Amino acid sequence: MRRPGVQNVDPTRAIALAAVAAIVGTQLIYFGLPFGLWLHGLVLGGLNAVMAVGMALIYRANRVVNFAQAELGTAPTAFAAAFILFWGWPYLLGFGAGLIMSVVAGVVVEFALIRRFRHSPRLVVTVATLGITQLLVAVGILIPRWWGRNLASERIAPPVGWKLTVGQVILNANHLIAFVASMMMMAGVAWFLARNRYGVAIRASAERGDRAAMLGIPVGRLNTMVWAIAAAMSYVALFLRSGIIGVPLGYAAGLPTLLQALAALVIARLERLPTVAAAAIALGLLESGVRFNSDTPAAAYPIMALVMFVVLLVQRTSSSRRDTDTASTWRGADEVRPLALSDRRNARVRLLQLTVITVGMVIVIGAPFVLRVDYIIKTSAIFAFAIIGLSLVVLTGWAGQISLGQMAIVGIGAAVSATCTSRWHVDLTLGLLIGGCAGGVVAFAVGVPALRLRGLYLAVTTFALGLATEQWLLSDRFFGWFPSGETRFERPPLFGRIRVDTPVRYYLYSLTVLALAFAATRGIRRSRTGRVIIAVRENERAAQSYSIPAVRAKLTAFVVSGVLAGVGGALYAHLNQSFSVTSYSTGESFSVFTSAVIGGLGSLGGALLGAAYLRGVRWFIPSQEWQLLSSGAGVLLVLLILPGGLGSLWITVRDVLVRLVVNRPPVADPDVPSPVPVEPAA
């Protein structure tokens, strides 16, 4: 009971403010900076805050975490920088042209893509932003090539010659413009949401879009406005950042900025704008302090990931309507349907199944004896990535959760397994199992803080894990517990007797491992564990009413996913007979996830189709930007046209063949009423 004159303190807000204070205190105590560099970090933190507030604005309007926020401003920034640096345009003219382009880009993205998913689960819209991210990254890389130049790390000169020397640090007009513009833009957004009638309408439509539409609020137009504002904020942050540290291009530039913005969102529980801005500025100062006090800037990534994990551990769970609304899962309508019992018992259908299985086995087993060596190796890689795809089917297709750092778990499993077999001479099969266990342990450690809360926290934390693993944990600059990229190791014989040192033998071994992983995953799906995971995905509250622990079910799915990912990574590392961290980057996690969506997350066979798509694109399209275009466009087309992925095409073909075999007419559309027979008049 509240005492008179005493206000209740929101524990969530108190935790967020304490986290911001702890970040600032950590920077001041352990990562001290000269005052000039502290001002430099404050300016960069302000620009990161603009990016984070733009993400929070979209989240407040759509309840969607926009992973394309950093890339919305990439293409306009590239154009503006090219206009100024290559064509000699004045600073203000180039900035204005880029600003107009960013607004147009935000409108086009919302109107042409996001609006098409307005009736889809929010998780599906979040996946769509991943496809948009890949498209925009590719466009940002291609733009400078139209001029035949390279924009990487080019700095835009300030429009005036103002300078301020603080110690040994020189701050120019770019710093002053960036600081003033970032503060004004965040203040403008706060005023817009609190005082402007459109801002109030945006807040109302975010809470209950259907009710807002019934009251005459133009929800679609407001969403377009929000995306245009967010794109403009992204552009302003990246353009002003270009004058300080260089033009950002590609994943390497956009992902660290996105990590800071996401960390700020996690601290603020995704929507408190003042806390988002304060956390982003504090993280910018912390990053500057880490960069100054360490030999490499990569040390900042594990620290930011640790901050996110600690904040998630101390945050309280909530069952309020707002937090319940943020919970969303992958669509379950496109799961593979088993054949009807009468069809399975039909002799001709059973003969057809036996024929298809026999022909498939003959082709797969006989392929290495007729293919060239390079094709045998490439097909073995497909088998390894198919196991990784199975891990995403379990996590996203069954549990309805997203992992954007799956390749980090794959890499850890690969590193542990390669270390066991190359240094400790462990049996290859045992090494694969150890790699799988390592992946499961990592998944458990990450899932405990992330899966306690409803929403997309697992996607955010695994994204942080991916960057921290790529830049720090699996970097030979910091650790040497795993084989370095230059070290080639031999595959040990199976059980000390059966050699798998040739491409054909390793192909057959990889095929066997894939078959066992497929059988194990299928068995889990048919068990009570699989049914519980599906039940929690479909209706978490209803499952909890039957005494099903929802968090434990989701954590189980993530651990199973981690084990499969670790086994796939171990298999891939021994295929290459070397370990290179570049094969397990965060960009690779994006590609693997989108390929799994293209293959189909509703079926185990979709994992194989997604792996074939991913590796096939890289065989025929060696250029990275065109690979990103094909992957981004592919996932958007699948979400729009074929929600079940390529795997659903096989199910359609299966149903047609079965119908022809049993000589049954097509099933009528249940939405179309059947004609009522009318008796002729006497």
Predicted feature residues:
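Transmembrane alpha-helices and adjacent helix-loop boundaries
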Residues: P4-G5, G32-L33, L39-H40, L44-L47, ...
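Membrane-embedded alpha-helical segments in integral membrane proteins
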Residues: A19-L33, M55, A75-L85, Y235-F239, ...
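Glycine-rich phosphate-binding loops of nucleotide-dependent enzymes
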Residues: V64-F67, S102, M184, R208
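Short amphipathic alpha-helical coupling elements at transmembrane boundaries
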Residues: R115-H119, A201-M214, A264, R291, ...
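Transmembrane helix boundary and interhelical loop/hinge segments in multi-pass membrane proteins
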Residues: F192-V200, A204-R208, I524-G530, V536
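Hydrophobic alpha-helical segments
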Residues: L262-R269, A278-L312
